[in-house]
């Protein structure tokens, strides 16, 4: 556990505290999580990991899809325009449909989970060929060459067991575990988050299109 203390006299967050009294029964509510990207603006549940480069993401270029245009970066951790959400609940599953038909050589994009470690699953394009790949804290592993233009990516998080697993599917029914499970670790001040990314190791170029992002938790 970690408590960030700035000692500014305003007060600090606590893990457990007395629930405020209310005058009547109220329904439990939570922030929106799932997104079909049909709106002209991003939902309030989304958070860019850094100040965004607004010329390189769009909800209008291809209606109903989020377009992430790749900027140059060496690794996932350095990627610009990472779009994230807070991890919710003890058990959660995030699934996304990625269209990788517009990738450029050197580009990587997909779904990731981050804290102090950056772990992602996605598609990389090298010398005109597309590969399913894993990226774990800077280490890149090509899994297999893929054809077609769409893939379903999934991350499953278990906060009680401190475990995160990555999956892929070509039909949104049969998901295949990809790589070993890894631990979640607190990092920076934002905590663990799940999100989408696109970057290019060679320069600026290429696009990832995300049709929807589905997030279930308990």
Regions found by a protein language model. Name each.
Residues 2-4:
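Short, small-residue-biased leader/transition segments that mark boundaries at the very start
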Residues 9-48:
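Extracellular carbohydrate-recognition regions
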